[in-house]
Amino acid sequence: MSNRIGPQRSTKTAAKLRLLPSTEEFDDFRRQDTGREVYSQIPQIEGSTAKRDAEHLGKRHREFLPRVTAYCTCDTFRVDLLFKFFQSRRSSHKTRPKQFDECIYSPYSYNNEETTDLLPDTLESSRGTLNRESSQESLQSIFEESGLDRNQPLFREVFCFTYGVVVLWGYTIDEEHRFLRELGRFEIEKLKIEDMEVEEFNYYITTLYQPRIFNDFIALRDASNYMIRLSISHAIAQSVKISLFEELVNETIDATKDTPQMIAETGRVNLKREEIMMAVGQLFILRININLQGSVLDSPELMWTEPQLEPIYTAARSYLEINQRVALLNQRVEVIGDLLSMLKEQITHTHDESLEWIVVILMGLLVLIALFSIVVDWKLFQ
């Protein structure tokens, strides 16, 4: 839905792994997570099954695994009305809404399916018999080697965050777009389709090894605990919101990158005062938006009330490189701040120049008036 660059994180293109602590490992995780390198490469994964799975699952398998997708669609939601909307769909869509500070959670079903078969008989029917059979054999070999259950549970869950992001688990692309249309009435300052930011993942359930995120595949052990998915969704939602900020900063820098060069070459900005004021206003609005919504980039309140979830959230946040991206974002905002100060100085300088010319002109007029008076007096005296 977007033509933008997308999340500026290395895990989008590089095969990196982040292990997720399971429930019984929370205490061990706190002792072990002491600031060392947050990623482990494939050869460091304990257990041959997990290693083989990490090597085999790739982009060509995404269409067969359940989806996890985050959309940044607006500035914020009408939270009260949205919660009432979910409450009104208990019978038709089997909703059970719950509110956690800045997030509304609810199941939201469009049909009665509770599992999905990753090897349906009609697999890839549109690609021809040979491709279909080779795809089935490839997937079947992965399931046999990794021990993945071909019948994966479909959660069909919605996590709506107050800062304009929704994370959807277990939906098809068509169902995601259908839900986004239903969500539209609750959006404030809705983004254009081309301005929306999207993060896409896939998930599967396995009990053979530790939960983890690798190559945007989320491996979970417990299918029944939605609080784990809430923790991961918090990190994903923050990541997609950061993507929006990154794109806004990039666009602003690209639009104003010629201004410093212009000043370096000519000593002034060859723009009209109105154009300079418009540029200053745009830069100022961007800084305000990032500063006002910067709280969404911090650890959510849920991690204080449910501290057992913090290790999972921290691990997902590390995989998404949120800390590094926020630091880089702040640096680029500082650059914008410097440019803002420079433009303000240019406006002040231009204004001072105008005042100086006004004073010069007035003094010239006074001199002319004085000379005229002298000439008139001299003629009268004659």
Curated annotation (Swiss-Prot):
Family per record: Belongs to the RMD1/sif2 family.
Protein name as catalogued: Sad1-interacting factor 2
Lineage, broadest ranks: Eukaryota, Fungi, Dikarya, Ascomycota, Taphrinomycotina
Native organism: Schizosaccharomyces pombe (strain 972 / ATCC 24843) (Fission yeast)
Keyword Ion transport attributed: no
Any one annotated GO CC term: mitochondrial matrix
Subunit structure: Interacts with sad1.
Transmembrane helix listed as a keyword: yes
Entry-annotated residues carrying Phosphoserine: S135
Described purpose of this protein according to its UniProt entry: Required for sporulation where it is believed to have a role in meiotic nuclear division.
Membrane topology field: Single-pass membrane protein
Key words, A-Z: Meiosis, Membrane, Nucleus, Phosphoprotein, Sporulation, Transmembrane, Transmembrane helix
